[in-house]
Regions:
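FMN-binding flavodoxin-like domain, especially the glycine-rich phosphate-binding loop
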Residues: 13-16, 22-37, 44-140
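Extreme N-terminal starter segment of soluble prokaryotic enzymes
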Residues: 1-4
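Short hydrophobic segments within beta-strands
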Residues: 6-8, 87
């Protein structure tokens, strides 16, 4: 199985989550590439069986959370018929940011198979557990 993990990170938390996801995927026996959204390898993306795309949760708790830097996510090539996993990182309450990320990716042609926001203080625990959950759901 070929998996690509793309991330958009402002402070390094989402990059760290992407690296942990990539490590867990590799430990499960898949071929994996981890890249920032600004450095996409289009052939890798086209050949991928599964794509993880991540960013951070932006916004204030009372004013509505949303995917951070959504404009850069929209620049990812269309993901028609690609199985995609959305992930985000947050500090406090992610609200419904994962659902908003799912909608953004589905509007971009993706088939979103899972979405989760990971607490930036618990990445080492939450990221591998999320990968195990996703891989148990996905057959390619």
């Amino acid at each position: 199985m070929k998996i690509v993990v793309l991330h958009q990170s402002r402070t390094g938390n989402t990059k760290r989550a992407a690296e942990l996801i990539g490590g867990a995927v590799q430990s499960a026996g898949a071929e994996v590439a981890v890249r920032p959204i600004s450095n996409i390898d289009y052939k890798e993306l086209a050949d991928a069986d599964l794509v993880f795309i991540g960013t951070w949760v932006d916004g204030l708790i009372l004013l509505g959370q949303r995917p951070g830097d959504a404009g850069k996510i929209k620049r990812v090539p269309k993901l028609w018929n690609k199985k995609v996993v959305a992930f985000m990182t947050h500090a406090l309450n992610p609200g419904n940011a994962a659902e908003k990320m799912t909608s953004l990716l589905e509007e971009h042609g993706a088939t979103v198979v899972a979405a989760r926001s990971l607490n930036r203080h618990k990445l080492e625990l939450e990221a591998p557990a999320f990968v195990n959950e996703v891989l148990s759901l996905v057959s390619v």
